[in-house]
Design a protein with these regions (language model features):
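Membrane-embedded helix-loop-helix hairpins and adjacent transmembrane boundary segments
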Residues: 1-461
Length: 461
Protein backbone atom coordinates (compact mmCIF):
# COMPACT_ATOMS: atom_id res chain seq x y z
CA UNK A 1 0.00 0.00 0.00
CA UNK A 2 2.91 2.36 0.71
CA UNK A 3 4.09 1.93 -2.89
CA UNK A 4 0.61 2.85 -4.14
CA UNK A 5 0.63 6.00 -2.02
CA UNK A 6 4.07 6.95 -3.38
CA UNK A 7 2.84 6.52 -6.95
CA UNK A 8 -0.15 8.75 -6.26
CA UNK A 9 2.10 11.38 -4.63
CA UNK A 10 4.44 11.39 -7.63
CA UNK A 11 1.44 11.69 -9.94
CA UNK A 12 0.02 14.66 -8.02
CA UNK A 13 3.39 16.44 -7.96
CA UNK A 14 3.82 15.81 -11.69
CA UNK A 15 0.47 17.44 -12.43
CA UNK A 16 1.41 20.50 -10.38
CA UNK A 17 4.84 20.65 -12.03
CA UNK A 18 3.34 20.51 -15.52
CA UNK A 19 0.87 23.21 -14.49
CA UNK A 20 3.77 25.45 -13.47
CA UNK A 21 5.54 24.78 -16.77
CA UNK A 22 2.34 25.59 -18.66
CA UNK A 23 2.15 28.90 -16.79
CA UNK A 24 5.48 29.88 -18.35
CA UNK A 25 4.12 29.20 -21.85
CA UNK A 26 0.85 31.10 -21.33
CA UNK A 27 1.89 34.62 -22.34
CA UNK A 28 -1.35 35.86 -23.88
CA UNK A 29 -5.11 35.44 -23.65
CA UNK A 30 -5.00 33.15 -26.70
CA UNK A 31 -2.31 31.03 -25.02
CA UNK A 32 -4.38 30.71 -21.85
CA UNK A 33 -7.70 29.85 -23.51
CA UNK A 34 -6.68 27.90 -26.66
CA UNK A 35 -2.91 27.21 -26.31
CA UNK A 36 -2.13 29.83 -28.95
CA UNK A 37 -3.91 27.70 -31.61
CA UNK A 38 -0.60 25.87 -32.14
CA UNK A 39 -1.17 22.16 -31.32
CA UNK A 40 0.07 19.51 -33.75
CA UNK A 41 -1.51 16.08 -34.33
CA UNK A 42 0.09 14.24 -31.40
CA UNK A 43 -0.77 16.80 -28.75
CA UNK A 44 -4.20 17.38 -30.28
CA UNK A 45 -5.18 13.69 -30.37
CA UNK A 46 -4.08 13.15 -26.79
CA UNK A 47 -5.78 16.20 -25.36
CA UNK A 48 -9.03 15.59 -27.29
CA UNK A 49 -9.25 11.96 -26.13
CA UNK A 50 -8.34 12.99 -22.59
CA UNK A 51 -11.09 15.59 -22.24
CA UNK A 52 -13.76 13.24 -23.63
CA UNK A 53 -12.89 10.25 -21.45
CA UNK A 54 -13.59 11.27 -17.89
CA UNK A 55 -15.04 9.75 -14.75
CA UNK A 56 -18.37 8.76 -16.30
CA UNK A 57 -16.60 7.26 -19.31
CA UNK A 58 -14.27 5.19 -17.13
CA UNK A 59 -16.00 4.41 -13.84
CA UNK A 60 -19.46 4.71 -15.38
CA UNK A 61 -18.67 2.36 -18.27
CA UNK A 62 -17.13 -0.23 -15.95
CA UNK A 63 -20.35 0.01 -13.93
CA UNK A 64 -22.43 -0.50 -17.08
CA UNK A 65 -20.21 -3.43 -18.05
CA UNK A 66 -20.82 -4.93 -14.60
CA UNK A 67 -24.58 -4.58 -15.06
CA UNK A 68 -25.02 -5.26 -18.80
CA UNK A 69 -21.79 -6.69 -20.16
CA UNK A 70 -20.23 -5.65 -23.46
CA UNK A 71 -23.21 -3.46 -24.36
CA UNK A 72 -22.05 -1.09 -21.62
CA UNK A 73 -19.70 0.35 -24.25
CA UNK A 74 -22.45 2.37 -25.95
CA UNK A 75 -22.12 5.51 -23.80
CA UNK A 76 -18.45 6.02 -24.72
CA UNK A 77 -18.98 4.69 -28.26
CA UNK A 78 -21.46 7.52 -28.90
CA UNK A 79 -19.00 10.09 -27.58
CA UNK A 80 -16.33 8.71 -29.93
CA UNK A 81 -18.75 8.71 -32.85
CA UNK A 82 -19.63 12.32 -32.11
CA UNK A 83 -15.93 13.30 -32.14
CA UNK A 84 -15.45 11.54 -35.50
CA UNK A 85 -18.43 13.26 -37.13
CA UNK A 86 -17.46 16.63 -35.64
CA UNK A 87 -13.91 16.23 -36.95
CA UNK A 88 -14.80 15.03 -40.45
CA UNK A 89 -17.94 17.06 -41.16
CA UNK A 90 -17.79 20.33 -39.21
CA UNK A 91 -14.08 20.89 -38.53
CA UNK A 92 -13.45 23.19 -41.49
CA UNK A 93 -16.26 25.58 -40.58
CA UNK A 94 -15.41 25.59 -36.88
CA UNK A 95 -11.66 26.08 -37.31
CA UNK A 96 -12.20 29.08 -39.62
CA UNK A 97 -14.43 30.96 -37.17
CA UNK A 98 -11.47 31.97 -34.96
CA UNK A 99 -13.61 32.29 -31.84
CA UNK A 100 -13.12 31.18 -28.23
CA UNK A 101 -16.58 29.77 -27.43
CA UNK A 102 -19.43 27.85 -29.03
CA UNK A 103 -21.94 30.50 -28.10
CA UNK A 104 -20.01 33.22 -29.91
CA UNK A 105 -21.27 31.41 -33.02
CA UNK A 106 -24.83 32.10 -31.90
CA UNK A 107 -24.18 35.85 -31.81
CA UNK A 108 -22.34 35.82 -35.14
CA UNK A 109 -25.27 34.09 -36.81
CA UNK A 110 -28.21 35.36 -34.77
CA UNK A 111 -28.01 38.16 -32.19
CA UNK A 112 -26.49 39.04 -28.82
CA UNK A 113 -29.34 37.73 -26.67
CA UNK A 114 -28.94 34.22 -28.09
CA UNK A 115 -25.29 34.30 -26.99
CA UNK A 116 -26.29 35.25 -23.44
CA UNK A 117 -28.97 32.57 -23.10
CA UNK A 118 -26.75 29.96 -24.73
CA UNK A 119 -23.85 30.98 -22.51
CA UNK A 120 -25.87 30.39 -19.34
CA UNK A 121 -26.84 26.90 -20.55
CA UNK A 122 -23.25 26.11 -21.57
CA UNK A 123 -21.82 27.23 -18.21
CA UNK A 124 -24.34 25.01 -16.41
CA UNK A 125 -23.41 22.05 -18.63
CA UNK A 126 -19.64 22.35 -18.28
CA UNK A 127 -19.83 23.04 -14.55
CA UNK A 128 -21.98 19.95 -13.96
CA UNK A 129 -19.63 17.74 -16.00
CA UNK A 130 -16.69 19.09 -13.98
CA UNK A 131 -18.64 18.33 -10.81
CA UNK A 132 -19.29 14.72 -11.88
CA UNK A 133 -15.58 14.25 -12.54
CA UNK A 134 -14.66 15.69 -9.15
CA UNK A 135 -17.18 13.42 -7.42
CA UNK A 136 -15.55 10.46 -9.15
CA UNK A 137 -12.16 11.44 -7.67
CA UNK A 138 -13.65 11.01 -4.21
CA UNK A 139 -15.35 7.72 -5.10
CA UNK A 140 -12.18 6.05 -6.41
CA UNK A 141 -9.85 7.14 -3.62
CA UNK A 142 -12.40 6.35 -0.91
CA UNK A 143 -12.88 2.75 -2.06
CA UNK A 144 -9.26 1.93 -2.94
CA UNK A 145 -7.35 3.79 -0.23
CA UNK A 146 -10.01 4.35 2.42
CA UNK A 147 -9.61 8.13 2.27
CA UNK A 148 -12.90 9.84 3.26
CA UNK A 149 -14.86 11.18 0.30
CA UNK A 150 -14.88 14.90 1.14
CA UNK A 151 -11.11 15.23 1.85
CA UNK A 152 -10.40 13.23 -1.32
CA UNK A 153 -12.61 15.56 -3.37
CA UNK A 154 -11.00 18.66 -1.87
CA UNK A 155 -7.47 17.35 -2.44
CA UNK A 156 -7.96 16.01 -5.98
CA UNK A 157 -10.18 18.89 -7.05
CA UNK A 158 -7.74 21.35 -5.53
CA UNK A 159 -4.92 20.00 -7.70
CA UNK A 160 -7.13 20.38 -10.79
CA UNK A 161 -7.93 23.97 -9.86
CA UNK A 162 -4.29 24.90 -9.25
CA UNK A 163 -2.91 23.72 -12.58
CA UNK A 164 -5.95 25.01 -14.48
CA UNK A 165 -5.70 28.47 -12.92
CA UNK A 166 -1.98 29.02 -13.32
CA UNK A 167 -1.46 27.75 -16.87
CA UNK A 168 -4.82 27.54 -18.61
CA UNK A 169 -4.98 25.50 -21.81
CA UNK A 170 -1.21 25.03 -22.00
CA UNK A 171 -1.21 23.39 -18.57
CA UNK A 172 -4.23 21.31 -19.56
CA UNK A 173 -2.54 20.18 -22.76
CA UNK A 174 0.65 19.09 -21.01
CA UNK A 175 -1.17 17.33 -18.17
CA UNK A 176 -3.63 15.76 -20.63
CA UNK A 177 -0.82 14.13 -22.60
CA UNK A 178 0.68 12.54 -19.48
CA UNK A 179 -2.80 11.51 -18.33
CA UNK A 180 -3.53 10.05 -21.78
CA UNK A 181 -0.40 7.89 -21.60
CA UNK A 182 -1.12 6.78 -18.02
CA UNK A 183 -4.69 5.71 -18.71
CA UNK A 184 -3.72 3.98 -21.96
CA UNK A 185 -1.15 1.89 -20.10
CA UNK A 186 -3.31 1.42 -17.01
CA UNK A 187 -6.50 0.38 -18.82
CA UNK A 188 -5.35 -1.40 -21.99
CA UNK A 189 -2.06 -2.94 -20.87
CA UNK A 190 -2.66 -3.64 -17.16
CA UNK A 191 -6.24 -3.75 -15.89
CA UNK A 192 -7.97 -5.20 -18.98
CA UNK A 193 -5.73 -8.27 -19.47
CA UNK A 194 -5.36 -8.97 -15.75
CA UNK A 195 -9.11 -8.64 -15.14
CA UNK A 196 -9.97 -11.05 -17.95
CA UNK A 197 -7.26 -13.45 -16.79
CA UNK A 198 -8.49 -13.25 -13.20
CA UNK A 199 -12.01 -14.08 -14.40
CA UNK A 200 -10.72 -17.20 -16.16
CA UNK A 201 -10.57 -15.84 -19.69
CA UNK A 202 -13.25 -14.79 -22.16
CA UNK A 203 -14.52 -18.35 -22.65
CA UNK A 204 -15.22 -18.82 -18.94
CA UNK A 205 -16.78 -15.36 -18.73
CA UNK A 206 -19.24 -16.35 -21.46
CA UNK A 207 -20.13 -19.50 -19.52
CA UNK A 208 -20.56 -17.85 -16.11
CA UNK A 209 -22.15 -14.51 -16.95
CA UNK A 210 -25.91 -14.09 -17.47
CA UNK A 211 -27.29 -14.57 -20.97
CA UNK A 212 -26.83 -11.56 -23.19
CA UNK A 213 -23.69 -10.21 -21.54
CA UNK A 214 -21.83 -10.40 -24.87
CA UNK A 215 -24.81 -9.13 -26.88
CA UNK A 216 -24.33 -5.51 -27.99
CA UNK A 217 -28.07 -4.88 -27.69
CA UNK A 218 -28.43 -6.24 -24.16
CA UNK A 219 -28.59 -2.80 -22.54
CA UNK A 220 -31.76 -2.06 -24.53
CA UNK A 221 -32.46 -0.20 -27.75
CA UNK A 222 -34.19 2.62 -25.87
CA UNK A 223 -31.05 3.20 -23.78
CA UNK A 224 -28.83 3.07 -26.88
CA UNK A 225 -31.07 5.67 -28.53
CA UNK A 226 -30.90 7.87 -25.44
CA UNK A 227 -27.10 7.62 -25.39
CA UNK A 228 -27.08 8.59 -29.08
CA UNK A 229 -29.25 11.63 -28.47
CA UNK A 230 -27.32 12.72 -25.37
CA UNK A 231 -23.68 11.86 -25.98
CA UNK A 232 -23.34 11.81 -29.78
CA UNK A 233 -25.04 15.17 -30.13
CA UNK A 234 -23.46 16.44 -26.91
CA UNK A 235 -20.00 15.81 -28.38
CA UNK A 236 -20.97 17.89 -31.42
CA UNK A 237 -21.66 21.08 -29.46
CA UNK A 238 -19.89 20.95 -26.07
CA UNK A 239 -17.65 23.93 -25.25
CA UNK A 240 -15.04 21.59 -23.76
CA UNK A 241 -14.82 19.78 -27.14
CA UNK A 242 -14.90 22.87 -29.35
CA UNK A 243 -12.26 24.57 -27.22
CA UNK A 244 -9.91 21.71 -28.08
CA UNK A 245 -10.67 22.21 -31.79
CA UNK A 246 -9.69 25.86 -31.41
CA UNK A 247 -6.23 24.74 -30.18
CA UNK A 248 -5.29 22.97 -33.43
CA UNK A 249 -2.80 24.63 -35.75
CA UNK A 250 -4.64 23.56 -38.94
CA UNK A 251 -7.83 22.04 -40.30
CA UNK A 252 -5.86 18.92 -41.27
CA UNK A 253 -4.87 18.36 -37.64
CA UNK A 254 -8.49 18.68 -36.54
CA UNK A 255 -9.72 16.26 -39.21
CA UNK A 256 -7.26 13.39 -38.90
CA UNK A 257 -6.14 13.63 -35.27
CA UNK A 258 -9.81 14.05 -34.32
CA UNK A 259 -10.63 10.85 -36.22
CA UNK A 260 -7.90 9.06 -34.25
CA UNK A 261 -9.24 10.41 -30.96
CA UNK A 262 -12.75 9.20 -31.79
CA UNK A 263 -11.56 5.69 -32.64
CA UNK A 264 -9.52 5.60 -29.43
CA UNK A 265 -12.65 6.51 -27.44
CA UNK A 266 -14.59 3.61 -28.98
CA UNK A 267 -11.85 1.12 -28.10
CA UNK A 268 -11.65 2.57 -24.59
CA UNK A 269 -15.38 2.02 -24.12
CA UNK A 270 -15.09 -1.63 -25.15
CA UNK A 271 -12.13 -2.15 -22.79
CA UNK A 272 -13.95 -0.64 -19.79
CA UNK A 273 -17.11 -2.66 -20.50
CA UNK A 274 -15.08 -5.89 -20.56
CA UNK A 275 -13.39 -4.91 -17.29
CA UNK A 276 -16.84 -4.46 -15.77
CA UNK A 277 -17.97 -7.85 -17.07
CA UNK A 278 -14.87 -9.47 -15.55
CA UNK A 279 -15.69 -7.75 -12.25
CA UNK A 280 -19.16 -9.36 -12.38
CA UNK A 281 -17.50 -12.79 -12.50
CA UNK A 282 -15.05 -12.07 -9.68
CA UNK A 283 -17.33 -9.93 -7.49
CA UNK A 284 -20.92 -10.95 -8.30
CA UNK A 285 -22.53 -9.44 -5.19
CA UNK A 286 -21.38 -5.82 -5.19
CA UNK A 287 -23.90 -3.68 -3.33
CA UNK A 288 -22.83 -0.57 -5.27
CA UNK A 289 -22.04 -1.34 -8.94
CA UNK A 290 -20.47 2.11 -9.32
CA UNK A 291 -17.59 0.82 -7.17
CA UNK A 292 -16.82 -1.99 -9.65
CA UNK A 293 -13.72 -0.22 -11.03
CA UNK A 294 -12.18 0.37 -7.62
CA UNK A 295 -13.13 -3.09 -6.30
CA UNK A 296 -11.68 -5.04 -9.22
CA UNK A 297 -8.53 -2.94 -8.96
CA UNK A 298 -8.14 -4.11 -5.36
CA UNK A 299 -9.07 -7.68 -6.30
CA UNK A 300 -6.70 -8.45 -9.20
CA UNK A 301 -3.74 -6.07 -8.91
CA UNK A 302 -0.65 -6.16 -6.75
CA UNK A 303 0.64 -3.05 -4.94
CA UNK A 304 2.36 -0.77 -7.42
CA UNK A 305 0.18 -1.87 -10.31
CA UNK A 306 -2.81 -0.88 -8.19
CA UNK A 307 -1.39 2.61 -7.79
CA UNK A 308 -0.80 2.84 -11.56
CA UNK A 309 -4.38 1.83 -12.38
CA UNK A 310 -5.85 4.22 -9.81
CA UNK A 311 -3.66 6.91 -11.38
CA UNK A 312 -5.17 5.89 -14.74
CA UNK A 313 -8.67 6.45 -13.38
CA UNK A 314 -7.70 9.75 -11.82
CA UNK A 315 -6.04 10.76 -15.11
CA UNK A 316 -9.29 10.21 -16.96
CA UNK A 317 -11.25 12.04 -14.31
CA UNK A 318 -8.93 15.00 -13.84
CA UNK A 319 -8.50 15.64 -17.57
CA UNK A 320 -12.26 16.04 -17.95
CA UNK A 321 -12.59 18.06 -14.74
CA UNK A 322 -9.91 20.52 -15.81
CA UNK A 323 -11.18 20.75 -19.39
CA UNK A 324 -14.75 21.46 -18.35
CA UNK A 325 -13.63 23.84 -15.60
CA UNK A 326 -11.69 25.94 -18.12
CA UNK A 327 -14.57 25.68 -20.61
CA UNK A 328 -17.10 26.96 -18.06
CA UNK A 329 -14.76 29.78 -17.05
CA UNK A 330 -14.13 30.74 -20.69
CA UNK A 331 -17.85 30.98 -21.47
CA UNK A 332 -18.56 32.89 -18.25
CA UNK A 333 -15.78 35.35 -19.05
CA UNK A 334 -16.21 35.81 -22.81
CA UNK A 335 -19.96 35.35 -23.26
CA UNK A 336 -21.44 36.71 -20.04
CA UNK A 337 -19.05 38.90 -18.01
CA UNK A 338 -17.07 40.74 -20.70
CA UNK A 339 -19.94 40.84 -23.19
CA UNK A 340 -22.95 41.71 -21.00
CA UNK A 341 -22.10 42.36 -17.34
CA UNK A 342 -19.06 44.57 -17.97
CA UNK A 343 -19.11 45.40 -21.70
CA UNK A 344 -15.88 46.90 -22.91
CA UNK A 345 -13.82 44.98 -20.34
CA UNK A 346 -10.47 43.93 -21.78
CA UNK A 347 -10.00 40.20 -21.24
CA UNK A 348 -6.54 39.30 -19.98
CA UNK A 349 -4.84 36.40 -18.24
CA UNK A 350 -5.43 37.82 -14.75
CA UNK A 351 -9.17 38.02 -15.33
CA UNK A 352 -9.17 34.52 -16.81
CA UNK A 353 -7.37 33.15 -13.76
CA UNK A 354 -9.75 34.85 -11.34
CA UNK A 355 -12.84 33.52 -13.12
CA UNK A 356 -11.33 30.04 -13.41
CA UNK A 357 -10.63 30.09 -9.66
CA UNK A 358 -14.21 31.21 -8.97
CA UNK A 359 -15.63 28.38 -11.07
CA UNK A 360 -13.25 25.94 -9.39
CA UNK A 361 -14.56 26.84 -5.95
CA UNK A 362 -18.13 26.36 -7.19
CA UNK A 363 -17.10 22.98 -8.62
CA UNK A 364 -15.71 21.82 -5.27
CA UNK A 365 -18.74 22.98 -3.30
CA UNK A 366 -21.20 21.23 -5.62
CA UNK A 367 -19.07 18.06 -5.72
CA UNK A 368 -19.24 17.85 -1.93
CA UNK A 369 -23.04 18.22 -2.00
CA UNK A 370 -23.97 15.94 -4.94
CA UNK A 371 -23.65 12.14 -4.76
CA UNK A 372 -25.03 10.65 -8.00
CA UNK A 373 -22.54 10.96 -10.90
CA UNK A 374 -24.80 9.60 -13.64
CA UNK A 375 -27.74 11.79 -12.57
CA UNK A 376 -25.58 14.93 -12.59
CA UNK A 377 -24.19 14.00 -16.01
CA UNK A 378 -27.69 13.37 -17.35
CA UNK A 379 -28.83 16.82 -16.20
CA UNK A 380 -25.85 18.41 -17.93
CA UNK A 381 -26.29 16.65 -21.27
CA UNK A 382 -30.09 16.96 -21.27
CA UNK A 383 -29.84 20.74 -20.93
CA UNK A 384 -26.99 21.04 -23.42
CA UNK A 385 -28.50 18.92 -26.19
CA UNK A 386 -32.13 19.79 -25.55
CA UNK A 387 -31.42 23.51 -25.46
CA UNK A 388 -28.49 24.21 -27.79
CA UNK A 389 -28.11 21.43 -30.38
CA UNK A 390 -30.77 22.64 -32.81
CA UNK A 391 -29.82 26.36 -32.95
CA UNK A 392 -26.07 25.64 -33.14
CA UNK A 393 -26.38 23.07 -35.94
CA UNK A 394 -28.91 25.36 -37.59
CA UNK A 395 -26.38 28.20 -37.46
CA UNK A 396 -23.91 26.05 -39.38
CA UNK A 397 -26.24 24.37 -41.88
CA UNK A 398 -29.58 26.20 -42.38
CA UNK A 399 -29.59 29.55 -44.16
CA UNK A 400 -33.23 30.21 -43.27
CA UNK A 401 -32.56 30.19 -39.50
CA UNK A 402 -33.55 33.39 -37.68
CA UNK A 403 -32.52 35.03 -34.38
CA UNK A 404 -36.04 34.75 -33.01
CA UNK A 405 -36.15 31.07 -33.93
CA UNK A 406 -32.85 30.42 -32.14
CA UNK A 407 -33.91 32.10 -28.89
CA UNK A 408 -37.33 30.43 -28.89
CA UNK A 409 -35.67 27.07 -29.60
CA UNK A 410 -33.26 27.34 -26.64
CA UNK A 411 -36.01 28.36 -24.22
CA UNK A 412 -38.50 25.73 -25.43
CA UNK A 413 -35.93 22.92 -25.38
CA UNK A 414 -34.68 23.71 -21.87
CA UNK A 415 -38.19 24.10 -20.46
CA UNK A 416 -39.27 20.78 -21.97
CA UNK A 417 -36.19 19.04 -20.54
CA UNK A 418 -36.75 20.48 -17.05
CA UNK A 419 -40.46 19.61 -17.09
CA UNK A 420 -39.83 16.01 -18.17
CA UNK A 421 -37.06 15.53 -15.59
CA UNK A 422 -39.42 16.81 -12.89
CA UNK A 423 -42.20 14.51 -14.07
CA UNK A 424 -40.34 11.33 -15.07
CA UNK A 425 -37.07 11.49 -13.09
CA UNK A 426 -33.52 12.58 -13.83
CA UNK A 427 -32.54 9.29 -15.50
CA UNK A 428 -35.64 8.95 -17.70
CA UNK A 429 -35.33 8.80 -21.49
CA UNK A 430 -38.15 11.27 -22.10
CA UNK A 431 -36.40 14.60 -21.25
CA UNK A 432 -33.98 14.53 -24.17
CA UNK A 433 -36.59 13.24 -26.64
CA UNK A 434 -39.22 15.86 -25.79
CA UNK A 435 -36.57 18.54 -25.36
CA UNK A 436 -35.24 17.98 -28.88
CA UNK A 437 -38.71 17.79 -30.39
CA UNK A 438 -39.78 21.03 -28.70
CA UNK A 439 -36.54 22.75 -29.69
CA UNK A 440 -36.70 21.62 -33.33
CA UNK A 441 -40.40 22.39 -33.81
CA UNK A 442 -40.04 25.85 -32.28
CA UNK A 443 -36.86 26.61 -34.23
CA UNK A 444 -38.38 25.73 -37.60
CA UNK A 445 -41.76 27.35 -36.99
CA UNK A 446 -40.45 30.65 -35.63
CA UNK A 447 -37.61 30.87 -38.19
CA UNK A 448 -40.02 30.40 -41.09
CA UNK A 449 -42.24 33.14 -39.67
CA UNK A 450 -39.44 35.69 -39.22
CA UNK A 451 -36.55 37.22 -41.17
CA UNK A 452 -33.46 34.96 -41.55
CA UNK A 453 -30.08 35.90 -40.12
CA UNK A 454 -26.88 36.53 -42.06
CA UNK A 455 -24.56 33.59 -42.77
CA UNK A 456 -21.55 32.84 -40.60
CA UNK A 457 -18.30 34.46 -41.66
CA UNK A 458 -14.80 33.08 -41.37
CA UNK A 459 -12.61 35.35 -39.24
CA UNK A 460 -9.19 36.67 -40.29
CA UNK A 461 -6.09 34.98 -38.95
Amino acid sequence: MLLDYLIMLVYALAMLGLGWYGMRKAKSQSDFLVAGRRLGPGLYLGTMAAVVLGGASTIGTVKLGYQFGLSGLWLVFMLGLGIIVLSLVFSRQIARLRVFTVTQVLEQRYQASSRLIGGVVMVAYDLMVAVTATIAIGSVTEVVFGIPRIPAILCGGGIVIVYSVIGGMWSLTLTDIIQFVIKTVGIFLVLLPLSIDGAGGLARMQEVLPAGFFDLGHIGLDTILTYFLLYFFGALIGQDIWQRIFTARSETVVRYAGLGAGIYCMLYGAACALIGAAARVLLPDLAVPENAYAEITREVLAPGLRGLVVAAALSAIMSTASGCLLAAATVLQEDIYARFLRPGTTSDIRLSRCITLLMGVAMLVLACLVNDVIAALSIAYNLLVGGLLVPIVGALLWRRASPQGAIASIVAGCLAVIACMARDGLLANSPIVYGLLASLATFVAVSLATRPAASLRAQPE
